[in-house]
């Protein structure tokens, strides 16, 4: 939330007119402040007033900007009342914004869709992609680390709700590589290969799996040492000490040092 809450200052709050609440049977919205962007306030002076669409957009933004916002439950009820397929609508809008490189707005919308339905696979996948693009465009270490965690958590959840989706395992492999967890990366990529059909990514990952064979053996040997199987683990690690291909590869010497 800390990267999004600053945008709350762009909104002001109004209340629905009593006659509108009565006409639309919206008793659950009585006394609930409705968010609207400041730029739309000028329309209050018009004959038609502020369009309900602006309130809908504001509610979506608010639940995406602040996951603990006080009136989020009422906003979600209202959005579902307006359109029972509202998460699909929001995801579609987010994809459009992402295509236009408006990544922050896309992320906010996808966070909102996930607040309405945390198991929505399309929202999870696209939120992951947007977060990847956001951290790839940044040089702030804390920001990058936080968004990498968002990517990782989204992928793990997506794996639970849609285990047959091959691309989840493709991206999970890279997430584990970034964390230096080679055995886990190999496991996810093998699953990707088994689930995917002929595609460019499949050939790429088959090549990466070959490259991972030695790092996986070294990582497993390190785990042997950690778990008390000293001789077995050190024998494997020492066997790679003079390997020219691994010269300068810090994980090997880190494991040997440990």
Residue ranges with predicted function:
Residues 113, 157-158, 192, 240:
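Canonical positions in the second alpha-helix
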């Amino acid at each position: 939330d800390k990267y999004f809450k600053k945008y709350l200052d762009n909104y002001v709050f109004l209340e629905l007119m009593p006659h509108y609440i009565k006409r639309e049977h919206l008793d659950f919205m009585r006394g609930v402040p409705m968010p609207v962007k400041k730029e739309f306030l000028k329309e209050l002076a018009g004959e038609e007033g502020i369009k309900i669409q602006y309130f809908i957009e504001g509610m979506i933004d608010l639940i995406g900007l602040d996951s603990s916002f006080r009136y989020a439950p009422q906003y979600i009820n209202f959005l579902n009342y307006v359109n029972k397929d509202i998460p699909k609508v929001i995801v579609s809008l987010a994809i459009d914004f992402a295509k236009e490189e408006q990544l922050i707005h896309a992320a906010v919308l996808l966070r909102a869709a996930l607040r309405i339905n945390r198991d929505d696979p399309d929202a999870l996948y696209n939120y992951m992609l947007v977060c990847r693009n956001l951290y790839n465009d940044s040089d702030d270490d804390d920001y990058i680390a936080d968004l990498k965690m968002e990517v990782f958590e989204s992928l793990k959840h997506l794996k639970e709700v849609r285990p047959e989706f091959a691309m989840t395992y493709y991206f999970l492999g890279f997430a584990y590589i970034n964390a230096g967890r080679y055995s886990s990366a190999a496991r996810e990529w093998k699953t990707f290969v088994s689930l995917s059909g002929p595609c460019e990514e499949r050939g790429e990952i088959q090549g990466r799996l070959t490259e991972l064979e030695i790092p996986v053996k070294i990582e497993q040997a390190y785990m042997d040492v950690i778990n008390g199987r000293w001789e077995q683990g050190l024998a494997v690690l020492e066997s790679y000490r003079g390997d020219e291909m691994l010269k300068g590869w810090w994980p090997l010497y880190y494991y040997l040092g440990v």
